[in-house]
UniProtKB/Swiss-Prot annotation:
Keywords, ordered alphabetically: Cell wall, Glycosidase, Hydrolase, Secreted
Protein's recorded name: Glucan endo-1,3-beta-glucosidase
GO cellular component terms, A-Z: extracellular region
Source species, domain of life: Eukaryota
Family as reported in the entry's similarity comment: Belongs to the glycosyl hydrolase 17 family.
EC number(s) from the headed UniProt entry: 3.2.1.39
Uppermost EC category: hydrolase
Protein's UniProt keywords contain Hydrolase: yes
Main location (coarse class): secreted
Reaction equations catalysed: Hydrolysis of (1->3)-beta-D-glucosidic linkages in (1->3)-beta-D-glucans
Record localization: Secreted, Cell wall
Protein species of origin: Pinus halepensis (Aleppo pine)
MF terms in GO: glucan endo-1,3-beta-D-glucosidase activity
């Protein structure tokens, strides 16, 4: 996945 902050 990409940046975890974007997923949240």
């Amino acid at each position: 996945t990409y940046n975890n902050n974007l997923i949240r």
